[in-house]
């Protein structure tokens, strides 16, 4: 089938030769992909990989899949075929996919050394995002959403009301990342929040905070194009490059108490945002790291936390419930459909996905949020 695939380190290109998926276990579903967003993880896989993808000549530890594999994990689509034990969806349903693989999926891969092994402790406790065997559809486990079709277990399928357009539905995955993070932080309705960075994850964090009833949201960002994007979402923007060493003091003063924010979310992952995420908090405030950091350590003063009983935590990925809650939030208007559409800065066919998708994002990072690719199964590019 047609796909934009990862062949080896530094080689992503369109092909007609990715095998079409087949149902192999009774609980699997085949989806005709409508839209799939390009994620920062996809870019990192090209620039720095293989990270999640198997190395050239090797197989993935979970599924035994080998390259080439279609990329893409932020997908929406229409159910094309269901296994005999599938009860969650039917042919023709609109759906999104929780692309994370865990112990719950080991039954799908009889050639894996982990086949039908006992679930890890994290999975037994319901934290599948922390699974010992964690992996992602479209990032090495099996081929993903930059293809005509994808196959996944019904456990990972989330039905989407047809009132939600399928291009907007493709944003449910990145929104679920930030929904999970805001839940992890213990966010309470009516609280104030600081978002550090207005890239794709920062902007998704804004939408989630608005949906959860934040009383005040301030976004700290220095790039003018991203500042404009954040303003379009109706939040206050602070540019720390204009205030130097007084930035934290000024930020704290922007809250109703003039004493700092109840919650902060680091979506940038650099030393200055790490420090700000803690120091801009009020007493008993919570700082949550969503950013993916490199291996370099950063200085940390424990008394920044201890003296005012602040909390520092982190969040990774999502679970199925996050997807279900995001879909409900969009459907009932807590997350505005028009706000979601603001995040879509490009749409391309998978045939053009490398030049007009990946290269566009790498060359013009600050002027793009989310570029969606489609195999055009149902005339999506009309």
From Swiss-Prot:
Its cofactor is Zn(2+). It is found in: Cytoplasm. Binds 2 Zn(2+) ions per subunit. Its EC number is 1.1.1.4. Its main location: cytoplasm. Signal peptide: none annotated. SUPFAM superfamilies: GroES-like (SSF50129), NAD(P)-binding Rossmann-fold domains (SSF51735). Zn(2+) 2 binds at residues 103, 120, 123, 131. It comes from the Eukaryota. Keywords: Cytoplasm, Metal-binding, NAD, Oxidoreductase, Phosphoprotein, Zinc. GO terms for cellular component: cytoplasm. The modification Phosphoserine is found at residue 63. InterPro entries: ADH-like_C, ADH-like_N, ADH_Zn_CS, GroES-like_sf, NAD(P)-bd_dom_sf. Disulfide bonds: none annotated. Zn(2+) 1 binds at residues 39, 73, 173. It catalyses: (R,R)-butane-2,3-diol + NAD(+) = (R)-acetoin + NADH + H(+). GO terms for molecular function: (R,R)-butanediol dehydrogenase activity; zinc ion binding. The keyword Lipid metabolism does not apply. GO terms for biological process: alcohol metabolic process; butanediol biosynthetic process. Belongs to the zinc-containing alcohol dehydrogenase family. NAD-dependent (R,R)-butanediol dehydrogenase which catalyzes oxidation of (R,R)-butane-2,3-diol to (3R)-acetoin, of meso-butanediol to (3S)-acetoin, and reduction of acetoin. Allows the use of 2,3-butanediol as an aerobic carbon source. Present with 8730 molecules/cell in log phase SD medium. Homodimer. This is (R,R)-butanediol dehydrogenase. The gene is BDH1.
């Amino acid at each position: 089938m047609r796909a934009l695939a990862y062949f080896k380190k530094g080689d992503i290109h369109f092909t007609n030769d990715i095998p079409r998926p087949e149902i192999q276990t009774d609980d699997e579903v085949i989806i005709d992909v409508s839209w799939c967003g390009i994620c920062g993880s996809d870019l990192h896989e090209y620039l720095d990989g293989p990270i999640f993808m198997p190395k050239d000549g090797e197989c993935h530890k979970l599924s035994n899949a080998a390259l080439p594999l279609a990329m893409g994990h932020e997908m929406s689509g229409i159910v094309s075929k269901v296994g005999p034990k599938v009860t969650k969806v039917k042919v023709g349903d609109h759906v999104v996919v929780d692309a994370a693989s865990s112990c719950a999926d080991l039954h799908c891969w009889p050639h894996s050394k982990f086949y039908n092994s006992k679930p890890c402790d994290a999975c037994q406790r319901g934290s599948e995002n922390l699974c010992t065997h964690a992996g992602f559809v479209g990032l090495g486990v099996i081929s993903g959403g930059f293809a005509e079709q994808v196959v996944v277990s019904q456990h990972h399928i989330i039905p989407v009301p047809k009132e939600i357009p399928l291009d907007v539905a493709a944003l449910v995955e990145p929104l679920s990342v930030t929904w999970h993070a805001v839940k992890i932080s213990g966010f309470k309705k009516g609280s104030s929040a600081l978002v550090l960075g207005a890239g794709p994850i920062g902007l998704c964090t804004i939408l989630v905070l608005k949906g959860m009833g934040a009383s005040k949201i301030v976004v700290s960002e220095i790039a003018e194009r991203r500042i404009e994007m954040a303003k379009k979402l109706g939040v206050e923007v602070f540019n720390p490059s204009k205030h130097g060493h007084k930035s934290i003091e000024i930020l704290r003063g922007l809250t109703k108490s003039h004493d700092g924010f109840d919650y902060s979310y680091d979506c940038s992952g650099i030393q200055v945002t790490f420090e700000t995420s803690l120091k801009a908090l009020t007493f008993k405030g919570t700082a949550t790291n969503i950013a993916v950091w490199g291996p370099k350590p950063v200085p940390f003063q424990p008394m920044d936390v201890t003296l005012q009983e602040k909390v520092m935590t982190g969040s990774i990925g999502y679970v199925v419930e996050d997807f279900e809650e995001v879909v409900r939030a969009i459907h009932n208007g807590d997350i505005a459909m028009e706000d979601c559409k603001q995040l879509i800065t490009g749409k391309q066919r998978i045939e053009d996905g490398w030049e007009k998708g990946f290269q566009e994002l790498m060359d013009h990072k600050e002027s793009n949020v989310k570029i969606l690719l489609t195999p055009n199964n149902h005339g999506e590019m009309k």
